[in-house]
């Protein structure tokens, strides 16, 4: 499937080296002021070619809105948008057109469909994630109207982990590092991987919070069984290229703790800790929503690797092209967009949870 969401639905299309990639965002309420500066800034954050720590492929990533916006406001109809591919170099992939690149989707796409677009991975390329960032910008505009903001940064590159989380610093950092003190060591780890024609994995931290410091997030976003907020977050992020694990709150560490250590105690002012990551019973509890997305090392490395071709013959694969040495860096921005899309979808879903909400809408007329 190529669609994410239920009430706010994003459908994407296009391939890495096709003429365009694009999306249709259906379910966006009317009357939302389109923040073009926000849209442009989000695309630039994800953009490659800005420094040595990301892919040299630098696309313009100008978002062409084709429908759903009139006089700078959303109309309530589907928002269609296109992003042109202008910097593709398909010749870089001629030598692997009949080979399966190790740990890429080539093998599975070929066996599932019997045909594959070998140019940059086609539909399986992370180039598609630019669409999710554009759609996430629209979702952010919706969330801003009700006082919710999402932000992200890098907490780990290889084994080098942040000890302090500063989201303001992440916005200024070349690698979106959350910890200024650990940033140089993390950069060195990436540079060493590049020097050795290798790549490295990383972990992104994404959070949602109230825009106002003295307010909480809405309680009750998500549903208790088949639309759990944490499940939908994990589903969205696991659908992103290279993500191999997603944690909410304490995540994996929870399995090492006792109940007396893990439980979030409460008083009249609220929760005394946030080990649950802002989600209880599949619904938001008002605290910050805390998510970690674990990215594998970029599978495109410039070392000879053993593989097979489409005829099952063993051979050697030596890649060319332009690739991210650490996909977690730009991936953190995409995860932030995905969290925004999921929360916007859940906000719209929540309108159906109480008859009072519907009465408020329809009794106004």
Curated annotation (Swiss-Prot):
Pathway of action: Metabolic intermediate biosynthesis; chorismate biosynthesis; chorismate from D-erythrose 4-phosphate and phosphoenolpyruvate: step 7/7
Family: Belongs to the chorismate synthase family.
This protein's encoding gene: aroC
Description of how the protein assembles with itself and partners: Homotetramer.
Domain of life: Bacteria
Ligand binding (FMN): 123-125, 241-242, 281, 296-300, 322
Binding site for NADP(+): 46
Protein name per its UniProtKB record: Chorismate synthase
